[in-house]
Amino acid sequence: MNKLALQGPLWLASDLHLGPATPATAEAFLGLLQAAADEASALLLPGDIFDAWIGDDVIRAAPPWLAAVLHGIRAAAGRIPVYLGRGNRDFLIGQELADALGAHLLPEPVLLETDYGRILLTHGDEYCTDDSAYQQFRAMVRNPQWQAQFLAKSIPERLAMAEQARGESQAANQAKSMEIMDVNPAAVEAALREADVDVLVHGHTHRPARHVLSVDGRKRERWVLPDWDCDHADPPRGGWLVIDRDGLQCFDLVEDED
């Protein structure tokens, strides 16, 4: 399994879903980047940083909203290590983007060796095994051959395909129960058992919480990262997780601003 040893306070945030229609969320994220650079020893972003990512070549002529976000990440990465994960919306994030930002690609899943101990980190969509239609889609778009064929298309073609896929996904999700789109308990237990860890951190489900469970007679924890929306949600929402020698603590974006 991929391993990553990091010391000091680690900040984690996911599911920002940044795009041209999320200026307030982007502004909040830029604030998080500055705060993390001041207070954290590393920042980890395990997936769905962007609402869509059609290939790293978009940075060569980035629209203003994206240029501002990339500038913020680059500035933070100049002060602390920044790790970019890939989610179900931005699975095409690649080495070109990481190199341009002075950041690192976050392997998935990854076993973090922290001051608090060993922690399993991943985006989380792989645990939603009850949603068979989504798992088929995930297997397709993670296939290197499919990715190569997609990236060979023009940017306008890729944008149109991404917009169509997003619309189909939203329509399909409206017909699915929340339980189907959540993680499967057996898949979570299997991951904890295989990694031999007591703590799992993931995003994806937009259901922030700390779950305590027992696996093989051991107390385990599953921490779910919050999603961000400061543009369309009322009240705005977002947050991040801090891992240090004392444990794990989740901070709410709105409460922190008050």
Curated annotation (Swiss-Prot):
Membrane topology note: Peripheral membrane protein
The note describing how and how many cofactors are bound reads: Binds 2 Mn(2+) ions per subunit in a binuclear metal center.
Q: Where does Mn(2+) 1 bind?
A: D15, H17, D48, H206
- What task does this protein carry out? Hydrolyzes the pyrophosphate bond of UDP-2,3-diacylglucosamine to yield 2,3-diacylglucosamine 1-phosphate (lipid X) and UMP by catalyzing the attack of water at the alpha-P atom. Involved in the biosynthesis of lipid A, a phosphorylated glycolipid that anchors the lipopolysaccharide to the outer membrane of the cell.
- What family does the database annotate? Belongs to the LpxH family.
The UniProt record gives the binding positions of substrate as N88, R89, D131, S169, N173, K176, H204
GO MF terms held by the record:
manganese ion binding; UDP-2,3-diacylglucosamine hydrolase activity
Needed cofactors: Mn(2+)
Q: Which reaction does it catalyse?
A: UDP-2-N,3-O-bis[(3R)-3-hydroxytetradecanoyl]-alpha-D-glucosamine + H2O = 2-N,3-O-bis[(3R)-3-hydroxytetradecanoyl]-alpha-D-glucosaminyl 1-phosphate + UMP + 2 H(+)
What top-tier enzyme class does this entry carry?
Answer: hydrolase
The source's domain of life comes to Bacteria
Q: Which cellular components does GO assign to this protein?
A: cytoplasm; extrinsic component of plasma membrane
Q: Please report the name of this protein according to its UniProt entry.
A: UDP-2,3-diacylglucosamine hydrolase
Q: In which pathway does it act?
A: Glycolipid biosynthesis; lipid IV(A) biosynthesis; lipid IV(A) from (3R)-3-hydroxytetradecanoyl-[acyl-carrier-protein] and UDP-N-acetyl-alpha-D-glucosamine: step 4/6
Q: Which UniProt keywords apply?
A: Cell inner membrane, Cell membrane, Hydrolase, Lipid A biosynthesis, Lipid biosynthesis, Lipid metabolism, Manganese, Membrane, Metal-binding
InterPro entries, per database record: Calcineurin-like_PHP_ApaH, LpxH-like, Metallo-depent_PP-like, UDP-diacylglucosamine_Hdrlase
SUPFAM superfamilies, from UniProt?
Metallo-dependent phosphatases
